């Protein structure tokens, strides 16, 4: 500000000195990032109870598929829809356990 009295004209002049115009319409191009989408996998297994074939469609990383493969070989078994309904209709409502 100039002088001891503040006027709107003085403030406006000082703002013009501080604020510089920004050109928002520019020719700059931004590179688009490519995102790696996990590959879809088809998994075939058999029902633990009736041994009917099961088919699952999964989307995962190769490491995730490898982990699922290990689980299916070691300690996880799958049930078909019919066997699953039968198993759960004959038990008390209980989740995640025998």
UniProtKB/Swiss-Prot annotation:
Keyword Oxidoreductase included in the entry's annotation: no
A Pfam entry, by short name: E7
Coiled coil regions in record: none
Short sequence motif named Nuclear export signal, residue ranges: 65-73
One Gene Ontology biological process: symbiont-mediated suppression of host type I interferon-mediated signaling pathway
GO molecular function, one term: DNA-binding transcription factor activity
Localization per record: Host cytoplasm; Host nucleus
ZnF endpoints (unnamed): 47-83
Subunit structure of this chain's protein: Homodimer. Homooligomer. Interacts with host RB1; this interaction induces dissociation of RB1-E2F1 complex thereby disrupting RB1 activity. Interacts with host EP300; this interaction represses EP300 transcriptional activity. Interacts with protein E2; this interaction inhibits E7 oncogenic activity. Interacts with host TMEM173/STING; this interaction impairs the ability of TMEM173/STING to sense cytosolic DNA and promote the production of type I interferon (IFN-alpha and IFN-beta).
Name of the molecule in the record: Protein E7
Phylogenetic classification of the source organism: Viruses, Monodnaviria, Shotokuvirae, Cossaviricota, Papovaviricetes
């Amino acid at each position: 500000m100039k002088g001891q009295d503040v006027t709107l004209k003085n403030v406006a002049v000082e703002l013009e000195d501080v604020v510089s115009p920004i050109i928002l319409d520019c020719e700059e191009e931004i590179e688009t990032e490519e995102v790696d989408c996990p590959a879809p996998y088809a998994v075939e297994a058999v029902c633990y109870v009736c041994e009917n074939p099961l088919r699952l469609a999964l989307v995962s990383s190769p490491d995730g598929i490898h982990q699922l493969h290990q689980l299916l070989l070691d300690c996880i078994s799958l049930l078909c829809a019919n066997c699953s309904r039968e198993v759960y209709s004959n038990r008390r409502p209980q989740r995640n356990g025998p």
